[in-house]
A protein has these predicted regions:
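Acidic, turn/loop-rich segments in luminal/extracellular domains of secretory-pathway
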Residues: 1-38, 46-71, 75-129, 137-199
Length: 199
């Protein structure tokens, strides 16, 4: 007796014997196929790609022969990408400035058993981050005396940096050589000027 796939219920079986001439009486019995909890089946999830410092959400789906309520669990193979599930929506959030790839594993659970895991790759593409210039305190210099400052900045991408500067007044000229900023007041000038520096 071979029940159909996922069938549960009862069936009546009638059995007779025959000697090729006459048949016996018929024996009837009932077969009961008891239900078992079927494992949910999680739908495949495509690989995903996002830019650095962005999040992404994907919708999850699964089937369950028993019609059980499905919940989902997800995990990342790196602490640089966090996973969070609300209902059937999976949200993935990389940490700030992370780029690279993460393998995400997802399972569906029907309250009793887990599905086979589905894995996919989340690729986080790098973007060029703006450098951060170290703050410069207000400066003073005697009349007719140039002043040279050493500039400093950081860049999470490790790029080579150049500097530029602009003076708010023609009475103070600025020049940049490497990371050195030289401020040269005009002859006999005294007063103030605002210097804007960028990296």
């Amino acid at each position: 007796l071979s029940p159909a796939s996922n069938f549960n219920g009862t069936g009546i079986i009638n059995v007779t014997a025959s000697d090729s001439t006459v048949s016996s009486n018929t024996v009837t019995f009932t077969v009961t196929v008891t239900s078992t909890n079927d494992v949910p089946v999680l739908s495949a999830i495509l690989d995903q790609t996002i830019a650095e410092d962005q999040s992404i959400s994907v919708s999850l789906s699964a089937t369950d022969e028993d019609g059980d309520n499905i919940t989902y669990l997800a995990a990342s193979d790196t602490s640089s990408v966090s996973t969070f599930i609300t209902g059937s929506v999976l949200t993935m959030t990389p940490v700030e400035n992370f780029n690279g790839s993460a393998t995400i594993s997802v399972i569906a659970n029907d309250g009793t058993v887990d599905s086979s895991p589905e894995t996919f790759t989340l690729t986080v593409s790098p973007v060029n981050d703006a450098p951060t210039l170290v703050s410069i305190s207000d400066q003073s210099t005697p009349e007719d005396t140039p002043l040279t400052l050493t500039l400093s900045a950081t860049d999470v991408d490790g790029d080579s940096l150049t500097y530029s500067a602009v003076s708010s007044t023609e009475n103070i000229t600025v020049s940049v050589s490497g990371s050195d900023l030289t401020l040269s007041p005009a002859s006999n000038f005294n007063g103030t000027g605002i210097i804007n520096v960028t990296a």
